[in-house]
């Protein structure tokens, strides 16, 4: 499992064909740098091990397991949503590690709250409700209202002079989860037991200083994908798939074709993986350092310098003595589905993001997601009932991080996400390609930038169609041939522009699809 540098999203943002036009190519945003204390880590060149290899290559060292060294999936913070995509005027529904939650802004406490997405009355989803005029979360099924602590404050159907039924514990929201905001992301602790009420004081979500550093620029993207957490994580850690699965999307260094080198430029990768323990692992690739902090975080810091002589086409181009960060928050949603929050930060070309709308950047991000989406969806189903280590042939060092992640998952994570018997082992059936490549519900509807852009461009499309009709009417009303021809030409141009815009809107915000054969 290769680290973040190989991640498709990261490449799309940072990769430039040449360093001189890095700023001009705004659609490929870059990444910032993470402050990590230097550690004396014993790094070993990682080689994957499979039963079919005659001479097993060297393996990363796994720290001997202690009795308590088992990863606890429900004793960690989980990212729910990026703050930039949340609207304080309404509640938002999300599913994280199988738990349906509602995120809403409590204006009395000036804080984001995370509740179980269930009204105690008739179990309707609170995320379909609203924030009332007093700042309470209101269930729109029967109007019950709740404060930031989950206490019921109003039951419209209760007699005004009768017993205060809203004060009953049964009227309170059953799950009020600890929550916080860190690095521009709302987090929650997936256990509503009162003993975890102040868990933030003793255990905090992993912090990346560069995401809050004003000298860095950062762009965030969120996308839900139709494959599970395990497949998502290993794909992000796999740099060698980038020149192939994302061919024609990312601008990679050009390589000279030869008998042993194809047009895509794939080549041998030297990846060194450090010790693996319950807290994850680190890895090194040329001028990039990567870190896996389970269960959700995988990030890399790319810091080239004049001493770096090796060229790696799987790494984004970063100016010398500058830093780029690629940060991935991998969120298990339910079996067969996961969510990714990607943050790309950098301390160069900072002004670009101030002039380029976020939805423009998301166009290329979503195209990267689409380009390997079907591959990963099918791969997950083929691996479902197989032993990964015995079924996959992994003879090269390029898959070092992928193997390291699988070893961590088997050794400490129980081989898969702990769903607590909330789901059956079976994966959901494969939907149609149209549904698989859906962008609207997996991204646009929940993205503050893309949703607004979609509405405005739809309005522009309608405006162009109306203009076409107006020009036709004007052409019929005038008698001068030259003026009539001009009106007809304008009507045709307006109609063609509306058709082009309609196709652009559909491919950008609703459904794009992908066919590798003709790229």
From Swiss-Prot:
Cofactors (names): [2Fe-2S] cluster
Catalyzed reactions per annotation: salvigenin + 2 reduced [2Fe-2S]-[ferredoxin] + O2 + 2 H(+) = 8-hydroxysalvigenin + 2 oxidized [2Fe-2S]-[ferredoxin] + H2O
Molecular function terms, GO-annotated: 2 iron, 2 sulfur cluster binding; chlorophyllide a oxygenase activity; metal ion binding; monooxygenase activity
Record-marked site positions (Plays a role in the stabilization of the metal coordination): 235
Cofactor, how bound (note): Binds 1 [2Fe-2S] cluster per subunit.
Ranges that cross the membrane: 462-478, 485-501
Record GO cellular component, one term: chloroplast
PROSITE patterns with a match to the protein in the record: RIESKE (PS51296)
SUPFAM superfamilies with a match to the protein in the record: Bet v1-like, ISP domain
Binding site for Fe cation: 241, 246
Main localisation: plastid
Keyword Oxidoreductase: yes
Enzyme Commission number(s) of this protein: 1.14.15.-
Subcellular location: Plastid, Chloroplast membrane; Cytoplasm
Domain Rieske residue range list: 77-188
GO biological process annotation, one example: flavonoid metabolic process
Pathway involvement of the protein, from the record: Flavonoid metabolism
Motif (Redox-active motif): 447-450
Transit peptide location: 1-46
Entry binding sites for [2Fe-2S] cluster: 119, 121, 139, 142
Membrane topology qualifier: Multi-pass membrane protein
Iron-sulfur listed as a keyword: yes
Record-linked PANTHER family: CHOLESTEROL 7-DESATURASE NVD, IRON-SULFUR DOMAIN CONTAINING PROTEIN
Described purpose of this protein according to its UniProt entry: Rieske-type, PAO-family oxygenase involved in the biosynthesis of polymethoxylated flavonoids natural products such as nevadensin and salvigenin, aroma compounds which contribute to the flavor of sweet basil, and exhibit pharmacological activities such as anti-allergic, anti-oxidant, antibacterial, anti-proliferative, and anti-inflammatory effects. Catalyzes the hydroxylation of salvigenin to produce 8-hydroxysalvigenin (8-OH-SALV).
Name of the protein in question: Flavonoid 8-hydroxylase 2, chloroplastic
Organism: Ocimum basilicum
């Amino acid at each position: 499992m290769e680290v973040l540098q190989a991640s498709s999203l990261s490449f799309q943002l940072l990769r430039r064909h040449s360093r001189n036009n890095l700023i001009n190519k705004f659609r490929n945003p870059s990444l910032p740098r993470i402050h990590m204390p230097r550690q004396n880590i014993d790094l070993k060149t990682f080689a994957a091990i499979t039963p079919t290899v005659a001479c097993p290559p060297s393996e990363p060292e796994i720290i001997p397991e202690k009795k308590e060294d088992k990863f606890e999936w429900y004793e960690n913070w989980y990212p729910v949503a990026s703050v930039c995509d949340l609207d304080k005027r309404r509640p938002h529904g999300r599913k994280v590690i199988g738990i349906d939650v509602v995120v809403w802004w409590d204006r009395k406490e000036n804080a984001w709250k995370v509740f179980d997405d269930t009204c105690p009355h008739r179990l309707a989803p609170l995320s379909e409700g609203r924030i009332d005029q007093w700042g309470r979360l209101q269930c729109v099924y029967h109007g019950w209202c709740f404060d930031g602590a989950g206490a019921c404050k109003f039951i419209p159907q209760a007699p005004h002079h009768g017993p205060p039924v809203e004060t009953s514990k049964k009227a309170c929201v059953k799950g009020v989860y600890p929550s916080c905001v860190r690095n521009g992301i709302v987090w929650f602790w997936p256990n509503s037991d009162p003993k975890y009420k102040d868990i933030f004081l003793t255990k905090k979500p992993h912090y990346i200083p560069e995401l809050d550093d004003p000298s860095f620029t950062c762009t965030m993207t969120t996308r839900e994908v139709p494959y599970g957490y395990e497949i998502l994580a290993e794909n992000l850690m796999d740099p060698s798939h980038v020149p192939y699965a994302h061919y024609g999307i990312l601008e990679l260094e050009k390589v000279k074709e030869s008998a042993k080198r194809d047009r895509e430029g794939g080549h041998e990768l030297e990846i060194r993986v450090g010790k693996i323990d319950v807290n994850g692992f680190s890895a090194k690739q040329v001028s990039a350092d990567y870190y896996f902090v389970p269960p959700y975080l995988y990030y890399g810091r790319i810091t080239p310098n004049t001493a770096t002589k090796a060229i790696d086409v799987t790494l984004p181009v970063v100016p010398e003595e500058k830093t780029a960060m690629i940060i991935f928050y991998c969120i298990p949603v339910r079996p067969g589905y996961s969510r990714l929050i990607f943050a790309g930060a950098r301390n160069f070309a900072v002004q670009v993001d101030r002039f380029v709308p976020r939805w423009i950047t998301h166009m290329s991000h979503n195209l990267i997601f689409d380009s390997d989406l079907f591959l990963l969806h099918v791969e997950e189903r083929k691996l479902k009932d197989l032993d990964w280590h015995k079924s996959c042939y992994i003879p090269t060092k390029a898959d070092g991080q992928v193997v390291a992640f699988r070893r961590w998952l088997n050794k400490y994570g129980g081989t898969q996400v702990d769903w607590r018997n909330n789901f059956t082992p079976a994966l959901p059936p494969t939907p149609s390609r149209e549904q698989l490549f859906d962008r609207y519900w997996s991204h646009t509807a929940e993205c503050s930038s893309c949703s607004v852009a979609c509405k405005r461009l739809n309005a522009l499309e309608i405006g162009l169609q109306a203009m076409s009709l107006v020009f036709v009417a004007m052409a019929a009303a005038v008698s001068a041939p030259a003026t009539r021809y001009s009106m007809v030409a304008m009507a045709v141009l307006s109609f063609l522009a509306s058709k082009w815009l309609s196709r652009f809107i559909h491919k950008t915000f609703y459904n794009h699809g992908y066919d590798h054969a003709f790229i």
